[in-house]
Amino acid sequence: MNTTDLVKLLPAGYEDACYEKKAITRKRTITNPLDLLRLILFYLSGNKSLIDVSQFALMSGIGKISDVGFMKRFLKSKEWIIWLSQHILPNPVLHYKKPRWLESYQVLAVDASDIVEKGAVKKLWHLHYALDLFTLTCSQFKITEQSTGESLKNFSLTKGCLVIADRAYGTIKSIEHCLAAGSDFIIRIKNKPFHIYDENGRKIVLSDWLRTIGNTAAQWKVYIKNSEKKLVPVRICACKKTEAEIAAEKIRIRKMESRKQRKLSDDTVFTHNYMFVITSLPSEISAEQILSCYRLRWQVELVFKRLKSLLGLGSIP
């Protein structure tokens, strides 16, 4: 792609935003926003080193800049890059309005993915990633050894965060970490992730409740026990899947049973007909709203696909 083609893709006002976000404060070597963006895109495309960027700047006629000099410019460009990301998105996403009930929350979809270290050893690492769902920007990330599994403890959470996560995060430790930070959560859970209780501390069975709900979203106030064995109130929200989803789930279960040579219990198979999440959100937020919000989580999976296909994130330099 040449410079002319690149300019056609940029949103209106990108030059003014560059100066407003202080990506360029002094016109030395890099004298205009387009040249800065060219260097940034070159650096991000295909595991380029800082020395590579310095050489590219010289050969492309931008000017002479050291590797350290570019890194300083790159770090100052964070807010401008975020602005570009938000304004270059397709209109349906860019203009999607956050529902009123979510206005006071920073909604984070979290997930993890494997990345491989280059070389003969090919060591596996884990990338833990938090996506702000209403700006579609990275809120935080962390790279750990493969032995560090999915847990909300991998993220720094604060009051006002609403974390959306899949079943891998449905543990007491993750929930405790979230609540201790003053955050809220919507987490999909397994059939028997941990014991759940009624207000009197008696164990109750999730599948028994699922058998009582109809075709509309339902909620159930239950309790879990924290590490101090104290009851903590939460809600389980659930809805029955569509006939097409149930049929697809049955095919997936049969393939899984064949592959693992292990048959699931009838009770577990039954629960696969439903989608259910656990949440700390207040009761005035309906089950329909909570389940609808959870369905936005797939955006973080798309981020991993984009990172790996466009930026080669499948490996660590």
Regions found by a protein language model. Give the residues of each.
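Short glycine- and basic-residue-enriched patches
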Residues: 95-99, 104-110
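Short Lys/Arg-enriched helix C-cap and helix-to-coil transition segments
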Residues: 80-92, 96
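Short alpha-helical "recognition helix" segments of helix-turn-helix
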Residues: 52-59
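Short acidic/polar, Gly/Pro-enriched loop/turn segments located at secondary-structure boundaries
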Residues: 98, 113-115, 136
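Single, function-defining residue in the core of a domain
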Residues: 1-47, 55, 64-65, 69-72, ...
